[in-house]
């Protein structure tokens, strides 16, 4: 899988750019604030149907413009796809091979991407939200149906929480509707939990392999699903998860009415990361946390390959300055041989370190992306 070329117009600060890309390595060099990360954001958006930086579409449109356009030409096995997204201040319009699509979520399952940036340290050291988002984004790309489950679950959860608030304030007293929401929450929520457990079962093997390579076998990383429903939930079948979830809601009912929100479910769960048996979020050094984040991203890359039959596009946003030689060379080894990669940097790092048959280097300045004729 690789992007042959991409057209951007008025996306963030990017003016009008048509870029012919290398099918392996592409390096984008420029000072901060020139548009490098905006370019990666556009690619990420086309793969995941969402920005990793904002939920407000208007922020994606260049100042004083009415719309932004991102169009890319994707080569996927023997298939060629033209994917076009127009972002207005109120709506997004998507076309695939010039055929209008009803939902922007139809982007999912076409272009697969893995993004690694300095912000990914939050994946390890910050709260559970970042790790849930990591799992959900990955699952939505390889299983677009999962995105539908997640969207439906969040709608049901919102309705249930609204009802709990009304019961808390005394505006309502009948709990009959709560039982209806409970059953829907259980049906969808249990499937989300099961999907997350399945992906963690695969990721933990891949992450362990990557981590041992990076650390020369000195450290072992372990991933596990930490559920708000029950210990050892990963050992349960789908119907057992439903029973546990249902019972949890019944047992929590009085407290939930008192607090006005739902206390258990996949929205409260976490991906636990340990290194040599130690909770790395609480006790790991920043170097260990960064290594763990890199291991997770490399595992994500290999997981998508195993699920989709080809590697996703790898986006590296100013990460080379954050990595020591060993971690940098591990990334270089991967991208040089198998993966179309986009790297952003503020200066020319040692490109001679990269053993790849082809490379394109681009200059990014004031929203304009141009190719360097020579290094």
Curated annotation (Swiss-Prot):
It is found in: Cytoplasm. GO terms for molecular function: ATP binding; single-stranded DNA binding. Keywords: ATP-binding, Cytoplasm, DNA damage, DNA repair, DNA replication, DNA-binding, Nucleotide-binding, SOS response. This is DNA replication and repair protein RecF. Its main location: cytoplasm. The keyword Transcription does not apply. It comes from Halothermothrix orenii (strain H 168 / OCM 544 / DSM 9562). PROSITE patterns: RECF_1, RECF_2. One of its GO terms (biological process) is DNA synthesis involved in DNA repair. Belongs to the RecF family. ATP binds at residues 30-37. It comes from the Bacteria. The gene is recF. GO terms for cellular component: cytoplasm. The RecF protein is involved in DNA metabolism; it is required for DNA replication and normal SOS inducibility. RecF binds preferentially to single-stranded, linear DNA. It also seems to bind ATP.
């Amino acid at each position: 899988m690789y992007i042959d070329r991409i057209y951007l117009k008025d996306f963030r600060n990017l003016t009008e750019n048509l870029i012919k890309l290398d099918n392996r390595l592409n390096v984008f060099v420029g000072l901060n604030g020139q548009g490098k990360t905006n370019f990666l954001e556009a690619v990420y958006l086309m793969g995941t149907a969402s920005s990793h930086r904002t939920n407000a579409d208007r922020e994606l449109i260049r100042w004083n413009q009415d719309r932004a356009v991102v169009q890319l030409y994707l080569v996927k096995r023997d298939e060629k796809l033209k994917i076009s997204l127009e972002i207005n201040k109120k709506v997004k319009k998507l076309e695939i091979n010039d055929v209008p699509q009803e939902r922007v979520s139809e982007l999912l399952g076409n272009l697969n991407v893995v993004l690694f940036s300095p912000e990914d340290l939050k994946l390890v050291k910050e709260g559970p939200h970042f790790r849930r988002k990591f799992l959900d984004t990955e699952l939505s790309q390889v299983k677009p149906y999962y995105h539908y489950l997640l969207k439906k679950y969040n709608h049901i959860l919102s309705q249930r929480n609204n009802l709990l608030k009304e019961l808390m304030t005394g505006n309502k007293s009948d709990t009959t509707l709560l039982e209806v929401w409970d059953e829907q929450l259980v049906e969808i929520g249990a499937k989300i939990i099961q999907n997350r457990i399945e992906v963690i079962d695969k990721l933990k093997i891949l992450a362990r392999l990557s981590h041992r390579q990076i650390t020369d076998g000195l450290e072992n990383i372990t991933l596990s699903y930490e559920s708000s429903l029950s210990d050892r939930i990963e050992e349960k079948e789908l119907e057992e998860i439903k029973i546990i979830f249902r019972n949890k809601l019944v047992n929590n009912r009085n407290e939930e009415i008192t607090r006005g929100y739902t206390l258990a479910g996949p929205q409260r769960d976490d991906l636990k990361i340990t290194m040599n048996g130690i909770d790395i979020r609480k006790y790991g050094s920043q170097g260990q946390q960064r290594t763990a984040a890199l291991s997770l991203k490399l595992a994500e890359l290999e997981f998508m390959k195993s699920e989709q039959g080809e590697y996703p596009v790898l986006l590296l946003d100013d990460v080379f300055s954050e990595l020591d030689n060993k971690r940098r060379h591990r990334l270089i080894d991967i991208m040089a041989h198998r993966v179309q990669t986009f790297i952003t940097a503020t200066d020319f790092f040692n490109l001679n370190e990269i053993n790849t048959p082809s490379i394109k280097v681009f200059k990014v300045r004031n929203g304009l992306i141009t190719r360097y004729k020579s290094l």
